[in-house]
């Protein structure tokens, strides 16, 4: 009956609940850490890359081409590279997400900065504010909601990506899922892990949507 089936599912060691949930947590941490670190690095670099913030064309172009390079290399390729460099594990996954998202965030952030309303910045400058204060009070309030919204979207997206790159050795539940599929035997465990991944992505997608709607609402 149903109670016996549930008891077998919970108590049967073949399901490997502890290891599966640990690997799932690794995947979540990989996505979160890679996204946060990338956004923290891209934030100051975007100010240097934006033409209206840093009037140095050479520096602007160098940084923009750097962003293009980072994001043009697929995350899976970065994962393979860092798996060879650091060995299999979450560090390779975090590094792959970090490199890819630094390029993506750098491009998105710098474009957002280049499209700000200069009137607000000029208003702060007109009262004699220092250059750093002009950016702090005239620019950051305009772009911060956009930056946070974009970061939240990629955090949710990277939760899925972390599963995929895990299959090439970057750790997390993706690697465990791939190992279970290769044996061509434990299809119950495969279905179990797939359901958990879908559940986590669904939850994170809804959290991300709610937070982004609130940020957009505050901005408007």
Regions found by a protein language model. Name each.
Residues 52-56, 72-78, 159:
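Transmembrane alpha-helices and adjacent helix-loop boundaries
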Residues 1-34:
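Periplasmic/extracellular loop-to-transmembrane helix junction in inner-membrane transport proteins
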Residues 131-165, 188-196, 200, 204, ...:
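Transmembrane alpha-helices
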Residues 33-67:
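Transmembrane-helix boundary motif in ABC transporter permease subunits
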Residues 88-139, 145-154, 209:
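Membrane-cytosol interface at the C-terminal ends of specific transmembrane alpha-helices
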Residues 64-98:
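Generic hydrophobic transmembrane alpha-helix motif, especially the helices
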Residues 43-48, 108-115, 158, 206-214:
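Membrane-spanning helices that line or support transport/gating and their immediate boundary helices
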Residues 84, 159-192, 196-197, 216-220:
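Glycine-rich helix-loop "coupling/hinge" segments at transmembrane-helix boundaries
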